[in-house]
């Protein structure tokens, strides 16, 4: 479900901008962090801590490092990459690592862009060297790179913008969990593209999602697939080879997809998209 957020520019020790929702039912702070000023890098107009000021904390899952390498891949990301960091509650202890989210600006002509979740924006810790002496993130922040701002046609100097965001693709089955190649659902129907080795969960988690998109896969070798029958939680093993129409089988969640050989590849085609 899409939510309403604000976009905010942050320091390069984090990603350079953030998304912050302003939906109803705001969370109450779980505590307050005493402010402590320091050598705060101000190149991207960050919210630097002030001595004696109390900053709200929002404890969800345990907070991690808000600066340095990204939590998801232990790597740094350039300003030109379409990447974001989620505040602690949404980050959910790395559960959303690698997810692709579509961000739509209320300003900038309503442009949208798809970005990858690579890090956490710490809602608990801050005002120290590890966090560039910046205040903790709010409970509703999505920290975004300058490339996201540019793609949305927004002025980074404003510092905060209203946006909506949700899991990409919206209105389509969320294809996810590919450990070698990330399938791109935006490609034209009928176009082949490499999928690669699949991990959990590969094709979504609800019957409604499953009805939205049909995929046809071409398997170069026999593969064993364990899948669940609807809500019965009954596992069935299916050995298949050649062309495979995913919507032929009565399951809502692929529990596991095991390749007969570790590095065997398969190809998939989006063959139809139902109107919701």
Swiss-Prot record:
- Cellular localization per UniProt: Secreted
Membrane-traversing stretches: none
Q: Which InterPro entries does the UniProt record give?
A: Kiwellin-like (IPR039271), RlpA-like_sf (IPR036908)
Which residue spans adopt a coiled-coil conformation according to this UniProt entry? Answer: none
Secretion signal span: 1-18
In terms of Gene3D superfamilies, this protein maps to: RlpA-like domain
A cellular component term from Gene Ontology for this protein is: extracellular region
Keywords from UniProt, A to Z, are: Secreted, Signal
Q: Name one Pfam family in it.
A: KWL1
Q: Which family does it belong to?
A: Belongs to the kiwellin family.
The name this protein carries in UniProt is Putative ripening-related protein 5
